[in-house]
Amino acid sequence: MQESGACRKKPAMPSRNAGSHLVVMKRIQRNGDGAMKRQKHGRRELREVKRTSRRSAKSEDFSGAEDENNGENETEVAVNNSESGEQEGVDDTGMAYNALLTLLGSEKPEKPTKRRKNDEAGVEEINEDDLEIHLTKSDDESDEENEPEVASDDEESDEKFNAFDFHFNQPSEDYMEKASQSVTSKWNNTTKETIDEYVVSTSTPSCMNKESVKLGISSIKKRVRDVYSEKHPSKISGIDASLLDSMLNYKSVLYPYKHYNNTFYRELYSMHAINHVFKTRDNILKNTEKIKHAQEMALEGKSHEDKEYRDQGFTRPKVLILLPTRNAAYEVVENILKYSGSEQQENKKKFKAQFNSNDVPPETKPQDFRDAFKGNNNDFFCLGMKFTRKSAKLYSSFYSSDIIIASPLGLSMILENPDKKKRQYDFLSSIEVFIVDRATQIEAQNWAHVNLVLKYLNKVPKEFHDADFSRIRMWYINDQAPLVRQTLVFCEYTTPPITSLVSSKSVNIGGRVRYKPIYTSKNCIMNSIGLRLKQIFQRFSSSSPMEDSENRFKFFINSMLPSLLSSTSYSDGILVYIPSYFDYVRIKNYMRNSTKFTFEGIDEYSTQSKLTRYRQQFISGKVKILLYTERLHYFRRFEINGVKTLLMYGVPSNPLFYKELVRCIGKSVFKEVADIDLSFVKVMYSQWDAIALERIVGGDRAPVLCSGTNEMYEFR
């Protein structure tokens, strides 16, 4: 935000022990004696699992038009709601998630809370410490009674190859057993092709003996395809066609979209997500009709084949989408609702009030910053979306949802509730499409939350949740769901943690596709700085990525620091940019205890008063050296004044940061505080920084810097 604090709203800087606020309604239904009313299950006698044989078609849980109350008296939480009509007691097996946190026991009296009225939404903000969780079973659905078994107007057309059936229904137990061994050991050679400005690399496990068929818009459900065709009449081509084909073939994908203005990929994965939900639902309804017909034949005494139809998971949710902010979630939900073609959209007004905002960062900030932090940048949310033939419901309970949209922070607070008895993760047991969008923003928040979500993804549930085991796919029962889970990762640029989501943490038998942007000396960020400034790249030796941090620190304290003042023409105005916060703390402690440098450090946890004071002292020369973290620059985008020499402890992950920091020297030159012939930039790097270097110097220069005979390279 602006240094003067003139911005209406600061982007949240989530700490690693983030305490957050939730938006909730205080309208909670209670009975006469003040106790919380318990919600009924509706058709409970048909939903409880009392045997493992096939149940009748009427107990099917994927359904049609809903007969629910509209949520006027619901407890509204940004996570989810349980909706029901009449209320009655239920036992513990009927408990399902209806809120984010359990921090107070239900037997404790309600504590007074501080309230902040939101006039537009009619809601109140309550600190999470005062939030009481209410675990109830999913809403009283009567969908199966009103839903036609097969939507005849929604059949696929021009589809010669059913990728959904091939990926989820056809794999046998023997095949999955072989696949579980091959995906962790041997993959076929990667094939590469160049499309537009990307190198597309495709890898498949050795067990995959069938080449994928090129798929396009024609293989998508008609109701989804019609919406797309109306909005995008021109034919999809190039990298977009390749990306859609990879999604529809259920391959795992890593796609750097390079620029914040590129948003079309979100249209594609939103369309893919709702298409998967509809195909799953129609597959179940068709099989239910077959089972019903077989039962009728049996009652008439006619012979029939007792065939199994395994088409379900342990729980209903099939798509999980992780996003960094509520504004990002708002945009994706709008896309999904658009492609669903739903005539009715429940709780849309509440959703808009809690997720949408017109706040924008000041125009003095870079465009990518303004895009990342526009609107509601709250990073604490979870939302369930449920779809029927004609309606869409927001804030559905997790166990009755088809799609779950959440921030990693919001979801992690559910998965690892402080009260172990009340932790919930069963709703993630049957996720088949896992999407991480704006991964670079999420990494800047706290990547540990993403790793936590992966820990619980496709984990065998603790409870049955009224599952019909005669319909559950065998690879779910055999704990092989990760083998078919599709992982889609979208980022502005790649980093090792982001890349690992597809390269090592995805074992999808459908294969994986990596899209790598082509950077050259002409389109790299260095070529766009517009400042003829000496830029020195200093390589240090590092034998492995695991030892890189230690080798970097030793090189810095043994080679860089001792010659820091002697190698520069200025004794002040030295800015040290440090990508890692942990390296920053280590360097700060070393310089304070083992050197006599006059320095200060500012980071993402510094108070506003310290940020202002140290930057002013740096300008005046009272502070000779200023340590500056990458995460602080991400959240604040300061234009540091008084910079005469720039030392980068590591290569910036975001190439735009390199350009912005170098221009800090340009600003000093313009103000005649520094001489362009005396100032310089020095970057420490190792061979393991090759990918980040490509974005700065270009793909043709990076290999030379990493493996050349010289250890120092200079550019102007």
Swiss-Prot record:
GO CC term, one of those recorded: nucleolus
Entry-linked InterPro entries: P-loop_NTPase, UTP25, UTP25_C, UTP25_NTPase-like
Residue span of region Disordered: 1-158
Chain intervals with Acidic residues compositional bias: 63-75, 121-131, 140-158
Entry's Gene Ontology molecular function annotations: rRNA binding; U3 snoRNA binding
Subcellular location(s) per record: Nucleus, Nucleolus
GO-annotated biological processes: maturation of SSU-rRNA from tricistronic rRNA transcript (SSU-rRNA, 5.8S rRNA, LSU-rRNA)
Keyword tags: Nucleus, Ribonucleoprotein, Ribosome biogenesis, rRNA processing
Listed Basic and acidic residues bias regions: 45-61, 107-120
Protein origin, superkingdom: Eukaryota
Pfam families given in the database record: Utp25_C, UTP25_NTPase-like
Gene3D superfamilies found in the cross-reference section: P-loop containing nucleotide triphosphate hydrolases
Self-association and partners: Component of the ribosomal small subunit (SSU) processome composed of at least 40 protein subunits and snoRNA U3.
PANTHER family: ORF PROTEIN-RELATED, U3 SMALL NUCLEOLAR RNA-ASSOCIATED PROTEIN 25 HOMOLOG
Family: Belongs to the UTP25 family.
Free-text function comment from the UniProt entry: DEAD-box RNA helicase-like protein required for pre-18S rRNA processing, specifically at sites A0, A1, and A2.
The protein, known as: U3 small nucleolar RNA-associated protein 25
Gene coding for it: UTP25
